[in-house]
């Protein structure tokens, strides 16, 4: 008989069993397959079919799987007793344990028995002893592997595992032969050690991906690694998982820029508070603060590490006075479009915001005054991107200081309609600033470079600084410099 005489899935079951129970060779009844009426009765975990070995194979330990005819009666009284199969079990057998089980797929009754013979027995003799009982269908006989206590305990555990035992009487008790030389019992610690198998490479990859995906994409890699002991063990030194996490932002839904608001005026009047409240409100669904405050000290970088931009919905340009170039500003505030690509330390990212909040102590007319004074038409692209303008005066209408004591006590003036009426006219914006929040003189000239007037009439290059001798120069220095006696 060859491997092709049996279903392929039965062969795969063999591999699983041999790994689980510490059993080596599978030896089956050598009669033709058709003589076994129902191979589906075989337990999906226990029974397997493999090539037949030599009938003269010697074995001292084995696991026997038995099935029973439909006409078999009183199985609990005799089916697990070694005296039912051997004439002199006290001489032939050293240890014998087993139990009845139900196949989880077919619900057929069968039994697993672990046998330790007093001496080596040939396979043909063992097979004939079990086959001689007419009510028995011999499923298979598996040769034991190893003689250590752990190997034997694994085989015993497999045959008397209470999790697989038949749940109903009279089959719900494991059979431990009274003549056993060793009092074997089910060892839970050994079973736990056996079931904790090393995962395959494919399964390990799936576990890592699933664990990474369980964390918010905006978390830093350090936060993920130190979130739990499981994450530490799984991700320690795993650069592939780190690279995978860094690219998760790519699959996030892209936001469209909906609003650009400017809140300007006196300090301490609630401008930054508005930006914070907006970020908190939008973060109610995502579970985090959705406001990112631009740090101009980072230069062209939008942060790094835990301070980098991580997909927040609100970009806050705090204390803004034109620190971003006008071209970059227009990209950040392009209504109806998605955010541009920006640099972050050790990488890059894409802005994915929907709101821009600009807070400043300077009127918008002074943001890019150096550009607009030279080319007033450049003001129009800036003007049309602003959807709301709010002014925070230094004093209340009654003349008292505008110093809100709580978030609800903020006083501001909405100038959006007046802003829209400018129609991109920079001169009108300057007049508006002069009326409400005048620009400082240094604001008007701060963009002027040292040699802007180099070709104007009367321009003179500044003289370089000259070292001035101190009027109280020490006599020793005078002598060292001139060689003359300073006292004469």
Curated annotation (Swiss-Prot):
Keywords annotated in UniProt: Host nucleus
Pfam entry (one): RNA_helicase
Matches recorded under InterPro entries: Helicase_SF3_ssDNA/RNA_vir (IPR000605), P-loop_NTPase (IPR027417)
Gene Ontology cellular-component annotations: host cell nucleus
Disulfide bonds: none
UniProt keyword annotation of Transport present: no
Signal sequence, renumbered to the chain: none
Entry function: Plays an essential for the replication of viral DNA. Presumably cleaves viral genomic dsRNA replicative form to initiate rolling circle replication.
Name used for this protein in its record: Replication-associated protein
């Amino acid at each position: 008989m060859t491997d092709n005489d049996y279903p392929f899935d039965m062969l795969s079951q063999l591999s699983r069993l041999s790994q689980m129970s510490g059993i080596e060779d599978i030896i089956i009844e050598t009669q033709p397959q058709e003589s076994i009426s129902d191979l589906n009765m075989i337990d999906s975990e226990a029974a397997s079919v493999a090539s037949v070995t030599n009938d003269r194979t010697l074995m001292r330990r084995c696991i026997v799987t038995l099935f029973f005819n439909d006409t078999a009666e009183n199985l609990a009284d005799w089916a697990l007793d070694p005296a039912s199969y051997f004439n002199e079990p006290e001489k032939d057998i050293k240890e014998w344990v087993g139990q009845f089980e139900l196949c989880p797929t077919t619900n057929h009754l069968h039994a697993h028995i672990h046998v330790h013979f007093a001496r080596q027995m040939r396979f043909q003799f063992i097979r004939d002893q079990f086959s001689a009982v007419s009510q028995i269908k011999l499923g298979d006989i598996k040769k034991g592997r190893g003689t250590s206590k752990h190997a034997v305990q694994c085989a015993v555990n497999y045959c008397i595992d209470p999790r697989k035992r038949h749940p109903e009487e009279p089959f719900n008790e494991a059979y431990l032969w009274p003549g056993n030389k060793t009092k074997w019992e089910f060892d839970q610690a050994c079973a736990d050690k056996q079931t904790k198998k090393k995962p395959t490479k494919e399964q390990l990859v799936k576990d890592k991906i699933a664990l990474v995906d369980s964390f918010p994409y905006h978390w830093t890699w350090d936060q993920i690694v130190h979130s739990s002991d499981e994450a530490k063990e799984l991700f320690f030194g795993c650069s592939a998982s780190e690279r995978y996490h860094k690219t998760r932002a790519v699959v996030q839904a892209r936001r469209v820029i909906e609003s650009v608001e400017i809140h300007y005026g006196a300090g301490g009047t609630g401008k930054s508070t508005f930006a914070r409240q907006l970020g908190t409100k939008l973060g109610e669904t995502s579970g985090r603060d959705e406001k990112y405050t631009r740090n101009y000290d980072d230069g062209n970088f939008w942060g790094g590490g835990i301070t980098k931009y991580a997909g927040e919905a609100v970009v806050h340009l705090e204390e803004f006075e034109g620190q971003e170039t006008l071209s970059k500003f227009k990209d950040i505030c392009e209504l109806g479009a998605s955010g541009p690509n920006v640099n972050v330390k050790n990488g890059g990212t894409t802005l994915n915001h929907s709101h821009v909040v600009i807070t400043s102590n300077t009127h918008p007319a002074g943001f890019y005054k150096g550009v607009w004074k030279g080319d007033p038409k450049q003001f129009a692209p800036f003007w049309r991107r602003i959807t709301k303008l709010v002014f925070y005066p230094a004093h209340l209408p009654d003349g008292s200081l505008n110093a809100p004591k709580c978030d609800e006590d903020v006083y501001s003036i909405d100038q959006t309609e007046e802003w829209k009426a400018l129609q991109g006219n920079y001169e009108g914006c300057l007049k508006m600033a002069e009326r409400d929040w005048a620009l400082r003189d240094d604001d008007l000239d701060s963009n002027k470079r040292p040699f802007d007037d180099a070709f104007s009439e009367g321009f003179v290059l500044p003289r370089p600084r000259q070292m001035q001798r101190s009027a109280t120069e020490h006599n020793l220095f005078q002598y060292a410099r001139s060689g003359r006696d300073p006292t004469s």
